[in-house]
UniProtKB/Swiss-Prot annotation:
InterPro entries: RsmH, SAM-dep_MeTrfase_MraW_recog, SAM-dependent_MTases_sf
Catalytic activity: cytidine(1402) in 16S rRNA + S-adenosyl-L-methionine = N(4)-methylcytidine(1402) in 16S rRNA + S-adenosyl-L-homocysteine + H(+)
GO molecular function: rRNA (cytosine-N4-)-methyltransferase activity
Assigned EC number: 2.1.1.199
NCBIfam families cross-referenced by the UniProt entry: 16S rRNA (cytosine(1402)-N(4))-methyltransferase RsmH
Cell compartment(s), UniProt: Cytoplasm
S-adenosyl-L-methionine is among the record's keywords: yes
Top enzyme class: transferase
Function description: Specifically methylates the N4 position of cytidine in position 1402 (C1402) of 16S rRNA.
Gene label: rsmH
Gene Ontology biological-process annotations: rRNA base methylation
Annotated protein name in UniProt: Ribosomal RNA small subunit methyltransferase H
Length: 325
């Protein structure tokens, strides 16, 4: 792997980054020397670095990310592993095509850590957070041609905005928020994270604001980010394809931060673990379906107290794992 010099010079700012549920990832992924591993959400490369270190550098890793800035930073971090690490600018749902491109036929482990990274949240110009004012963007890949959150907020109908906030944010105030957004943009376009947060907060009754532990805009920002980046669709595509690409004994580890995502993973693993689907009154199986995975996590694995004290953002992380039969 060739490191990007512009980011390698600042590499020290990323080495302190500790990825979420790191010990749990290594436990369930159980990487071994000579294995081939996919990190579909490379981010700053923390999980990948730990996987390679666990194998003494004697493994092969494919890292994907659609955030060019994060990809460049991870490339610098993983440069010591040389050509044993391959990185690509891509969505994790594209993993199979990239495996074909580089000649990989099977995986011994696959990891995706879904959601926005600390680097993205902490960079105001990316527009993911309302804690620091910035342009209303929220795209994982700002250089791409997908519409930003600003476009969605300033052009979406009340019905469309309500659907997004209700579905992806599960916010009971979705209708009020959608109407408040449309009313506010009629006066002036909503172009910054601070203004959107103010508009959303104004839609909440005072009694709701008083009893809520989180900022009223939290769910709306989450919903818009998921809609802008097609996050649920991305996950569905990945889950439909990953089992076919796993070697026997290969493990799939998925970290989610949203109940909808966790539900998709839970159901996908459950369905792949099922055998015969024939009605009970049929004495001999005619469907031919056989279990393809063993589910390793009966319930989602969450962060321990020590990690929560060190990183409050880990509080909503849930890990599920399955092993290819």
């Amino acid at each position: 792997m060739t490191a990007d010099n512009g980011h390698d010079n600042n590499r020290h700012q990323y080495t302190a980054h500790v990825p979420v549920l790191l010990d749990e990832v290594l436990h369930y992924l159980s990487p071994v020397r000579g294995g081939r591993y996919l990190d579909g959400t490379l981010g700053l490369g923390g999980h990948s670095e730990a996987i390679m270190n666990r194998c003494g550098g004697d493994a092969w890793l494919l890292g994907l990310d659609r955030d060019r800035e994060a990809l460049a930073a991870a490339s610098g971090r993983l440069a010591p592993f040389g050509d044993r690490v391959t990185t690509r600018y891509a969505c994790y749902s594209q993993f199979a095509a990239i495996m074909d491109e580089i000649g990989w036929t099977g995986l011994d482990g696959a990891l995706i850590d879904i959601g926005v990274s600390s680097m993205q949240i902490d960079t105001p110009s990316r527009g993911f957070s309302f804690y620091a004012d910035g342009p209303l963007d929220m795209r994982m890949d700002p250089s791409g041609d997908m519409p930003s959150a600003g476009v969605l907020v300033n052009t979406g109908s009340v019905e469309r905005l309500k659907e997004i906030i209700s579905t992806y944010g599960e916010d009971p105030m979705a209708g009020r928020i959608a109407r408040a957004i449309v009313d506010a943009r009629a006066r002036n376009p909503i172009e910054t994270t601070a203004r959107l947060a103010e508009v959303v907060e104004s839609a909440y009754p005072a009694k709701w604001r008083a009893k809520s532990r989180n900022h009223p805009a939290t769910r709306t920002f989450q919903a818009l980010r998921m809609a802008v980046n097609g996050e649920l669709e991305e996950l569905e595509t990945f889950l439909a394809a990953i089992v076919d690409r796993m070697n026997p004994g290969g493990r799939i580890v998925v970290i989610t931060f949203h109940s909808l995502e966790d539900r998709l993973v839970k159901n996908a693993f459950r369905d792949e673990a099922k055998g015969c689907l024939c009605p009970r009154h049929i004495p001999v199986c005619v469907c031919g379906k056989k279990p393809r995975v063993n589910v390793l996590t009966r319930k989602p694995v969450t962060a321990g107290q020590a990690e929560l004290q060190a990183n409050s953002r880990a509080s909503s992380a849930k890990l599920r794992a399955a092993e290819r039969i």
